[in-house]
Amino acid sequence: EDRVLTLTKHICGEGIGIYGIFLMLINAQRFAKMTCLGQEVVAWSARDENQHVDGLTWLLNNELSENPNQMSPEIVNKILTMFANSVERGVALAKRAYQQGSLRDLSIEQIEVFLKQLANARIAQLNIGIDAVFPDVSKEILPQVGVLFAKSTLVNFFEASNTNYSVGSLTGDWVYPDENYQTDHELEQEILNG
């Protein structure tokens, strides 16, 4: 029982709770507010959280298949409560952020609907016999939501090799403090040529 509830807690935290913030950040990008690296970091973060949730869901479903007798109506109710609380906390966080000013073309109500849709999608992936936490929520999807669940084709800067952009960037006379100093290019050539 403890493993099931612990895995569920993490699925809710990583798979629902922070997605209201992701939605707000993605919405800002629609109006040229967080571009370039900021945009990529949000996409990588969402991809990372999706991978965590996929793994946690797999673990939970395996736990349930190996120990089917541990599911009881009481545990199902605890799981439903966790999902509902996660949506409630995500909405509360969005409301807190909106105290500083609302975002263009994104209301608190839209964030709440999105989080409820997400909770429904996440719980449907669990093998507990529940299709939706919020069965009456709208089926209309916000257009910007797809970015959060797209498989990223971007190269994560933590995974990519470094690129040296400094070649030829300095002009004029430059005196190196050490007469034996070699540039990166010179060192590479020395290593390659033996």
Question: What kind of region is each of these model predictions?
Answer:
Residues 1-194:
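Non-heme di-metal
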